[in-house]
A protein has these predicted regions:
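N-terminal beta1-alpha1-beta2 submodule of the flavodoxin-like/Rossmannoid cofactor-binding fold
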Residues: 20-96, 103-105, 203-208, 214-221, ...
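A short hydrophobic beta-strand element
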Residues: 226-234
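Helix-loop-strand module that forms the ligand-binding subsite of alpha/beta enzymes
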Residues: 65-149
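Stable alpha-helical elements in mature extracytoplasmic
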Residues: 30-37, 41, 105-109, 137, ...
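Compact beta-sheet-dominated globular domain cores
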Residues: 148, 192-196, 244-267
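C-terminal helix of von Willebrand factor
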Residues: 157-180
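Bacterial Sec-dependent N-terminal signal peptides
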Residues: 1-20
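N-terminal trafficking/processing presequences and adjacent post-cleavage segments
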Residues: 174-210
Length: 267
């Protein structure tokens, strides 16, 4: 109990310090999903907010975006963006949002970080994705912005964006960005071989995803007040015949009728 009280006191102290800082939610959204998360962040934080816009807007069509993105990546010509109205120098903390494209932040964000000075700023990434990309995009930001302080970020699958409000509440409190109390999440249990029941949970959560994720081999679990969470080690074989491993996270709500949900894959 003493440890919990000390942790809560530390979080409260951080949140008090955070309240004295100026915060901007700065984001790019192609089809509105990242915008939904950005506006929820702005609502919970009471921060300023601004959207990054490409001069030549992307169409929102999946295949068209892939084709255009491939051309931009191959040529190294990132898309021109409209000048942002906010002055980055006026802010201490910037929540930087984007969809994941090609395993990292969307190309308009590449232009943004190249053309603006983020030195000395605290950057909190947030992203939306089909399967994952928070970890890889955060590492890319660290390389692109070596003089900024890149913090732990938040990511959510597009298919689960309705869960963002509740998850952001926990994320912001846990990381000291707003006041409040949340019980710490337990650690996942030791990895053990999957059972047929575990495989059924994995299949129910992942079978509708458009790309094969592989075969679950090991699993660690944890119980929270509202969910049973699974951390699967998954093996797959690429087109070159080489085997690779990834971690796939699945959650199952404890309410009646809840279905398993695939939350993220980390490669």
């Amino acid at each position: 109990m003493r440890k919990l009280l000390l942790s809560l006191a530390m979080v409260t102290g951080i949140a008090t310090s955070f309240a004295q800082q100026k915060v901007l939610v700065l984001y790019y959204s192609e089809n509105g999903t990242t915008k939904t998360v950005a506006e929820e962040l702005q609502k919970q934080l009471g921060a300023d907010i601004e959207a990054v816009e490409a001069v030549e807007a992307y169409t929102g069509d999946f295949q068209a975006t892939i084709q255009r993105g491939n051309k931009e990546r191959e040529s190294g010509q990132w898309p021109a963006i409209k000048a942002i109205k906010k002055n980055i120098k006026d802010y201490d903390i910037i929540f930087l949002g984007y969809p994941i494209w090609f395993g990292t932040y969307a190309m308009p964000i590449a232009t943004l970080v190249k053309e603006n000075d983020f030195a000395g700023k605290t950057i909190v990434p947030f992203c939306t994705f089909g399967s994952g990309g928070l970890n890889t995009s955060s590492e890319a930001l660290k390389k692109a912005l070596p003089k900024a302080n890149i913090k732990q970020g938040y990511g959510v699958r597009t298919a689960r964006v309705a869960a963002a409000a509740k998850e952001l509440d926990r994320f912001l409190i846990e990381n000291g960005y707003k006041e409040g109390e949340v019980a710490p999440l337990p650690a996942y249990g030791e990895l053990v071989p999957v059972t047929p029941e575990d495989s059924a949970v994995f299949s129910a959560a992942c079978s509708t995803y458009q790309f094969p994720l592989g075969t679950p081999k090991m699993v660690g679990k944890r119980e929270t007040e509202t969910t049973t969470d699974y951390k699967f080690t998954v093996k797959s074989t690429g087109m070159n015949g080489e085997e690779s491993a990834s971690t796939v996270y699945v959650t199952v709500g404890k309410e009646e009728g809840a279905q398993p949900e695939f939350t993220e894959v980390v490669r």
